């Protein structure tokens, strides 16, 4: 399962871009509009956190600027009748912190501004998010809010565990990274750890 990708921009469409990795393989990555709008020129380096959607007739990659945004996407697609395209439309209009405020304010109208979401669907999504966002307690947000290295370490180890890395493998790498740069947030620490772990393997 692809969870992170680095490469160079080969092509850009209205909803996606093609990222060519160092090995010469090109992947089409669907992106929220805020990422598409600030993509660099062709040939420039990019990196995204990825969620892979496997269907009977296709394998689709969805890319995000950080771990928090990726986790928010997963929460959204766990809601009944919310598919990947709708979840991406939500994140094209609202960032994760915006979405949390919408849930806290019980703002149904804000969700109806998303293309394809009517009032009834917005009410259903909001109800589900009240439960799911609280239960999930999205890790990157907690790390950023706390600003505590210990919290960053804990949340990054948990995120790597979700990607299949054992704690005894991930924790020493992260401790070393955070020792060198204690000001890193969860997303930055996770990115550095993934690079280090990939080299080690």
From Swiss-Prot:
Has three domains with a flexible linker between the domains II and III and assumes an 'L' shape. Domain III is highly mobile and contacts RuvB. Residues 148-201 are annotated as: Domain III. The keyword DNA damage applies. Residues 66-143 are annotated as: Domain II. It comes from the Bacteria. This is Holliday junction branch migration complex subunit RuvA. Its main location: cytoplasm. Residues 1-65 are annotated as: Domain I. Residues 143-147 are annotated as: Flexible linker. It is found in: Cytoplasm. InterPro entries: DNA_helicase_Holl-junc_RuvA_I, NA-bd_OB-fold, RuvA, RuvA_2-like, RuvA_C, RuvA_C_sf. Pfam families: HHH_5, RuvA_C, RuvA_N. Keywords: Cytoplasm, DNA damage, DNA recombination, DNA repair, DNA-binding. Gene3D superfamilies: 5' to 3' exonuclease, C-terminal subdomain, DNA helicase RuvA subunit, C-terminal domain, Nucleic acid-binding proteins. The lineage of its organism: Bacteria, Pseudomonadati, Thermodesulfobacteriota, Desulfovibrionia, Desulfovibrionales. Belongs to the RuvA family.
